[in-house]
A protein has these predicted regions:
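Catalytic grooves of carbohydrate-active enzymes
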Residues: 203-204, 211-222, 306, 319, ...
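A glycine-centered loop/beta-turn motif at secondary-structure junctions
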Residues: 76-77, 102-103, 117-130, 134-144, ...
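Metal-dependent polysaccharide deacetylase catalytic core of the NodB/CE4 family, i.e.
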Residues: 30-38, 105-114, 239-333, 340-351, ...
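Short alpha-beta junction capping motif
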Residues: 75-117, 272
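C-terminal single-pass membrane-anchor helix
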Residues: 440-499
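Active-site beta->alpha N-cap acidic-glycine motif
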Residues: 187-192, 196-269, 282
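A short, well-structured beta->alpha microelement
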Residues: 51-77, 88, 360-371
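His/Asp/Glu-enriched short active-site or ligand-binding loop at hydrolase and phosphoryl-transfer sites
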Residues: 330-366, 408-415
Length: 499
């Protein structure tokens, strides 16, 4: 009897602990985003991906659904509706949102009546108008032609930013009061991205971060090392800290080509360059459990073993919504930058994404160049440049950044932790496995054999391509065996019946 009582008591404790863990998880459930359309071939195309990257940079985990889905909203504390079509929000959603206790932002042309009542909202429609958007801090975008949008003419609460038109003058970009917010327009690659951040920060109560970083992508073992050295020297001479997205090495790491790659990255590191590891190139949408995790850990160890402190990760946005990539690929890193999608190859797509502790919002240098006014961004940004192909491109980038307040990524607290290695930065110092790194700007290249370079190239083509090669070999061998059996059987058949 006594044993039964003890077992029952332990069972109650376990159930209580599980429930408490579940409650904790639900209390920090992130943001639920609903959208009606991907807005292909319209002015709004790309705004969903932009919103997802913005929320990640704000430190928000995301659950994403289309209007046709029917998820449980009972535990959701933050909701964003993104309307790209002209159609109104379905009635079933209007009632559910009206009954919800969540903080709620509506983006688009037709806010539901209950939201208009809550915000005492009145709007005026404009079509084919040139508009200029300004943020709360005075950041101004270039004028753009908008097919149709609303201008807010009356509201309750706090107004954020401005939309200016030649015909109608200025009106607030967005408004917020208590648990409700509204913005009439949101597009990728214009000032509405940052104007919306002001509205969402006020609604969700999140802290503003305002660092600006310079990010150079496309660095890998096959980049022009002389150009990379020139880049590091030029940025260093101009006093501009920078971040390099460096491709991984996970096979043939003892080859001379790999060692020389590590050598140039050490040089970059000594010239105020921060190294982030870019994820492996994906060529095939499948991966056995643990394969990517092993590759990421090997790649981190290659850098660590060569005194290169990779302080975070870079990847296209879709990695954050893939069951394998987001878990095995991102697990070691507390810092990362999500880049716009270029070529999407999922293993298995999922509708929820995680958030890095630190994740600057990547914008192209061309887009950055269109902004004017007070260059105060409401979230951390990474002004992103592809690897420079010429000194002319390098000079243009340095001139663009020369008078800007560019931050040093190493001044933040970053941590990368695998089974084998721990890499950290603290107040500008770099540590690998609790040992401070001595920054060394002496280049000690080793002679590279052509054969080794070619082998290394094969090892870095893409970590899923090996499966393609394996399956191709299996299929060819199988067809060969079938052919041999067919010929053998045919001869037996002919021998039997010819007699």
């Amino acid at each position: 009897m006594r044993k039964k009582i003890i077992l029952a008591f332990l069972l109650v404790l376990v159930i209580f602990f599980i429930n408490e863990q579940d409650i904790t998880a639900k209390a920090d459930d992130g943001v639920t985003v609903f959208y009606d359309s991907l807005a292909k071939n319209t002015d709004n195309e790309g705004n969903i991906d932009s919103l997802l990257r913005i929320l990640n940079s704000m430190g928000e985990r995301v659950m994403m659904y289309s209007w046709n889905e029917n998820p449980d909203l009972s535990e959701t504390s933050k909701i964003i509706i993104l309307q790209n079509k002209q159609a109104d929000l379905p009635d079933k959603w209007v009632q559910r949102l009206k009954d919800s206790k969540a903080k709620f932002a509506y983006i688009g042309g037709n806010p539901p009546a209950f939201l208009a009542d809550k915000l005492q909202l009145k709007t005026e429609a404009v079509t084919n108008a040139a508009v200029t958007i300004r943020t709360n801090n005075g950041l101004i975008g270039k004028p753009q032609l908008v097919a149709d949008t609303n201008l807010i003419t009356s509201y309750k609460g706090t107004g954020f930013g401005e939309i200016n038109t030649a015909e109608k003058g200025s009106s607030p970009y967005g408004v917020q009061s208590e648990n409700y917010a509204y913005a009439p327009i949101f597009q990728a690659n214009n000032a509405s991205e940052f104007a919306l951040v002001d509205v969402l920060r006020a609604l969700f109560g999140t802290k503003e971060e305002t660092n600006q970083y310079a990010l150079i992508t496309g660095v890998n073992p096959f980049a022009d090392f002389n150009m990379l050295k020139k880049t590091a020297d030029t940025f260093y001479e101009k006093g501009i800290p920078f971040v390099v997205s460096a491709g991984p090495v996970f096979y043939n790491s003892d080859f001379t080509a790999a060692k020389n790659y590590a050598e140039i990255l050490r040089y970059v590191q000594a010239k105020n360059g921060t190294i982030l590891m870019n994820v492996p190139a994906v060529t095939y949408g499948a991966s056995p459990a643990g394969e990517l995790e092993n590759i990421i850990q090997k790649s981190v160890h290659f850098f660590a073993d060569n005194d290169v402190a990779a302080l975070g990760v870079t990847a296209e946005l879709y990695w954050n919504f893939d069951k394998v990539y987001s878990t095995e690929g991102f697990a070691p890193f507390n810092s990362g930058i999500l880049l716009p999608n270029e070529k999407i190859i999922y293993t298995t797509k999922k509708n929820n994404g995680n958030a890095f502790e630190k994740s600057p919002f990547s914008i192209t240098s061309d887009f950055y160049g269109t902004m004017s006014g007070q260059m105060n961004f409401p979230l951390d940004i990474a002004i992103t440049y592809p690897f420079f192909n010429s000194e002319k491109e390098l000079k243009a980038a340095v001139n663009q950044l020369a008078d800007e307040n560019i931050s040093d990524f190493r001044l933040q607290t970053n941590e990368v932790k695998t089974v084998q290695d721990t890499i950290e930065s603290n107040a500008g110092s770099l540590y690998i496995n609790d040992q401070a790194i001595m920054l060394d700007s002496d280049l000690k290249y080793l002679k590279t054999k052509k054969m080794e370079t070619q082998k290394q190239a094969g090892s870095l083509e893409g970590f899923f391509s090996y499966q393609n090669t394996f399956f191709t070999i299996v299929i060819v061998l199988s067809l060969g065996i079938i052919g041999i059996l067919f010929i053998f059987g045919y001869r037996l058949y002919m021998k039997k019946y010819m007699k």
